[in-house]
């Protein structure tokens, strides 16, 4: 025999409990918003090169480094880097970026082209960066080989295992191989 329950037959406390999703509870938000603990927190300072790549400055904050790779995708550094610094001033963390209105982010990105797509990508990426269990950033929305290689080279000291395809990353990677003994890199 099947029993159909209506709101009248369910105790009021059960109905009230359902109205509050875990998503909105402060306990859930605190846990979700803390950055994932990963290899990125091992001590590794990539050496400064003659190429002065933006990754050499942002290695200490993987989210910012990965945001830079989104900015640099199909855009010259000369155009992207000034807008990147402006973006990071307004949106200094994944928590702030994931809560942003994509239209505001899009307006900031207009000089770079693909601004609506990039804005939505940045917001979704920032959310996944905080909430998804990931090992490498290529698992996150908007991050491809370039972003993944940058993370592995500059954030977690896996430069020996990486074979970059980007010309600037290749220059840095080749420079590391040429100088790793002199720089005492393992």
What label would you give each PLM region?
Residues 49-186:
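Catalytic cores of DNA base-excision repair glycosylases
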Residues 1-59, 171-186:
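Intrinsically disordered, low-complexity, charged terminal extensions of DNA damage-control enzymes
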